[in-house]
Amino acid sequence: MPGLPKNEHEALEFLKSNNIKWVDLQFTDLLGKLQHITIPSNEFDESSFKVGFGKLDGSSIKGFTSIYESDMVLLPIPQTMTLIPWMQGVARVLTKVFWGGGKGRFERDPRGIAEEAEKYQSEQGYVSYFGPELEFFVFDKVEVDASLPQSGTGYKIHSREAPWSKNGGYVIRYKEGYYPASPVDQLMDIRLEIISTLVDYFGFTIEAAHHEVATAGQGEIDFRFSTLADTADKVQVLKYVTKNIASKRGMIATFMPKPFFGDNGSGMHTHFSLWTKDGKNLMYDPNDEYAELSQIGRYIIGGLLEHGRALSAIVAPTTNSYRRLVPGYEAPVYLVWSKSNRSAAIRIPAYYKGMEKAKRLEYRPPDPSSNPYLVFSAILMAGLDGIRRKLDPGDPVDENIYHMSEEKKRSLKIRELPGSLDEALNELESDNEFLKPVFNSSILQAYLDLKKEEAKMMQLYPHPMEIYQYLDS
């Protein structure tokens, strides 16, 4: 399989040697959706990676620009040039978004925020690494009736392995998807195709792929950790490849957090570590008896707990996110930390002892409906604020908080994550100073405005369960 280009020259050679006819220019919008424009490959030359392509109408992208300042430029990132293996003679490349007219980088380009975060941490003498675990569902079909909301809305999920399936084959019972072998696991072949494509064409190193806890085709793919912007790029690629391979098979992949009631939702647990530039893990202390965690590591946790409610608006950014973040489904609800407690927002993995390179934290609230460029940048900034202010995270909580009395939770001063998107947005609106060295006011305000509009719109529609519950009122 073709190797990934390392520079502009190799990217141009890549187009020639692979007989590429079309190139997909891809970028991420403010809400985390991957967008694209396709151009002829013969438009690429030596200047393309310096001048870019004036192809984007920014007024057509939510949260970008208005119609009177809509001309924008997409600047290709040569190291991201790859084949699209399910299309003949087509390549794709990720791009940076610039204002037209030579006015510089577009301040609401999410990838630009990730680059600013990397620059900011470098100025502080740090390097960070991120390793997200992406969960998702692959359904056979989803029927949605929302075109005439006045007469009612609804949806139906078809899944060959779900308890409600009528296919006559094996089913996976609720919460028993972790880890039955095939043929009970009926989606191993599609996961293998996804991870093989990621490795062969997109430069991934895969660490694991497996069925997840939920029925109806829930899976997880874990790839090797990397630096902030590169990891966010890989999240977008993984979602893109997964959706396309499912679609090619006549199925549908979704990264929404909670597509149906009664089973676990999909998260994006994010592993994070902070290092010096000369390769020392700042979170590791072999003399710490509890978790081999350093004082700096505790300060990072303190920052994440301090700003956890505000972070929710970025890491759990949809109304559906808060149907996942409820007790009973292995999702975090409480802003505490622990060595192995999966009801806590922050977990310190304890697979190994005495291994500096493996010391990290796992931040559990994020889900894959989020914008990874903003998520990883916000996690970094909260952690750095914890270091700067020496925020004490308090003692770890190792018992199941779901079973803890309200009185005990109050005595331990345990705070909960927001219970809704509205609540999370209010928290972000009042607590965002820690983000401002990297998140400019333009992107913060645009994000808040878009998400408030989204939350308000969702509140207008009666829910099918409301009909069930209140029809006899």
Swiss-Prot record:
GlnA of S.acidocaldarius is unique among the archeal glutamine synthetase since the regulatory properties suggest a position within the GS I-alpha subgroup. However, the sequence shows more pronounced similarities to the GS I-beta subgroup. Binds 2 Mg(2+) or Mn(2+) ions per subunit. Optimum temperature is 90 degrees Celsius. In the absence of magnesium or manganese ions about 50% of the activity is lost within 100 minutes at 78 degrees Celsius, whereas more than 95% of the activity is retained in presence of 4 mM manganese ions. Magnesium ions are a less effective. Probably involved in nitrogen metabolism via ammonium assimilation. Catalyzes the ATP-dependent biosynthesis of glutamine from glutamate and ammonia. One of its GO terms (cellular component) is cytoplasm. Mg(2+) 1 binds at E133, H269, E362. It catalyses: L-glutamate + NH4(+) + ATP = L-glutamine + ADP + phosphate + H(+). Residues 18-102 form the GS beta-grasp domain. Its EC number is 6.3.1.2. Disulfide bonds: none annotated. This is Glutamine synthetase. It is found in: Cytoplasm. The gene is glnA. Oligomer of 12 subunits arranged in the form of two hexagons. Mg(2+) 2 binds at E135, E212, E220. It holds the Pfam family Gln-synt_N. Keywords: ATP-binding, Cytoplasm, Ligase, Magnesium, Manganese, Metal-binding, Nucleotide-binding, Phosphoprotein. L-glutamate binds at N264, G265, R324, E330, R342, R364. InterPro entries: Gln_synt_N, Gln_synt_N_sf, Gln_synth/guanido_kin_cat_dom, Gln_synth_cat_dom, Gln_synth_gly_rich_site, Gln_synth_I, Gln_synth_N_conserv_site. It comes from Sulfolobus acidocaldarius (strain ATCC 33909 / DSM 639 / JCM 8929 / NBRC 15157 / NCIMB 11770). One of its GO terms (biological process) is nitrogen utilization. Strongly inhibited by glycine and L-alanine. AMP at 10 mM displays a very weak inhibitory effect. The activity of this enzyme is not controlled by adenylation.
